[in-house]
């Protein structure tokens, strides 16, 4: 198996497992409400595994290695920034709290929510 294929598979998978475990570990269960495992796994998938997969995909496409750490950090920062802004917009859209266009949402303070 090629090393880039291993990166595309194992990096998001390991990150999914670690973030799910951290969400379970740091859960505030003082309210007595038990959150199902699937909720933790979905949250970890949306917030960690998808950006990790996109970062690994771009690193494989442009053949970044460990010597290109500045490029990898820049690419992952751009992916995280864009992904967080898009995800927060669609999250509010699905909750019914958002009724404007994406550009209107960005200019009215949505960018600070993504940061």
Curated annotation (Swiss-Prot):
Annotated GO CC locations: plasma membrane
Organism placement in taxonomy: Bacteria, Pseudomonadati, Pseudomonadota, Gammaproteobacteria, Pasteurellales
The UniProt record lists the keyword Transmembrane: yes
Keyword Cell membrane recorded: yes
Protein name: Uncharacterized protein HI_0559.1
Keyword terms: Cell membrane, Membrane, Transmembrane, Transmembrane helix
Superkingdom, taxonomy of origin: Bacteria
Transmembrane segments annotated in the record for this chain: 7-27, 40-60, 72-92
Cellular compartments annotated: Cell membrane
Annotated membrane topology: Multi-pass membrane protein
């Amino acid at each position: 198996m090629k090393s880039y294929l291993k990166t595309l598979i194992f990096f998001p998978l390991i990150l999914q497992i670690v973030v799910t475990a951290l969400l379970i570990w740091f859960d505030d269960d003082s309210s007595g409400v038990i959150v199902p495992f699937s909720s933790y796994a979905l949250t970890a998938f949306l917030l960690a595994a998808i950006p990790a997969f996109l970062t690994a995909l771009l690193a494989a496409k442009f053949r970044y290695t460990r010597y290109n750490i500045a490029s990898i950090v820049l690419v992952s920062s751009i992916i995280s920034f864009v992904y967080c802004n898009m995800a927060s917009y669609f999250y509010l859209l699905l909750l019914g709290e958002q009724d404007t266009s994406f550009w209107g949402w960005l200019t009215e303070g949505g960018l600070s929510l993504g940061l």
